[in-house]
């Protein structure tokens, strides 16, 4: 018994029929196209993650700058009140 109730002989017969219908060159081309599509998908996913990381870093820098500005204004306020 093979996959899902299909025996190994049935799988071999289907493989032979596919080879006869499409030929090896066309199957190689399809395999290459499929590999290229998978590679492109993975690249797009990693690019998306990199963009998300850059956005998070920019947000952290913005928050840090706002905190520094708030600290500076508080310090100036203290100086003016001390006078």
From Swiss-Prot:
InterPro entries: TatA/B/E (IPR003369), TatA/E (IPR006312). The chain crosses the membrane at residues 2-22. The keyword Membrane applies. Residues 50-65, 74-83 have a biased composition (Basic and acidic residues). Belongs to the TatA/E family. Part of the twin-arginine translocation (Tat) system that transports large folded proteins containing a characteristic twin-arginine motif in their signal peptide across membranes. TatA could form the protein-conducting channel of the Tat system. This is Sec-independent protein translocase protein TatA.
């Amino acid at each position: 018994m093979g996959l899902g109730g299909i025996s190994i002989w049935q799988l071999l017969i289907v493989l032979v029929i596919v080879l006869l219908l499409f030929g090896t060159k066309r199957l190689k081309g399809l395999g290459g196209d499929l590999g290229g599509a998978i590679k492109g998908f993975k690249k797009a996913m990693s690019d998306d993650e990199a963009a998300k990381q850059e956005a998070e870093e920019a947000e952290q820098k913005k928050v840090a700058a706002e905190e520094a500005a708030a600290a500076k204004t508080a310090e100036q306020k203290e100086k003016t009140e001390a006078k």
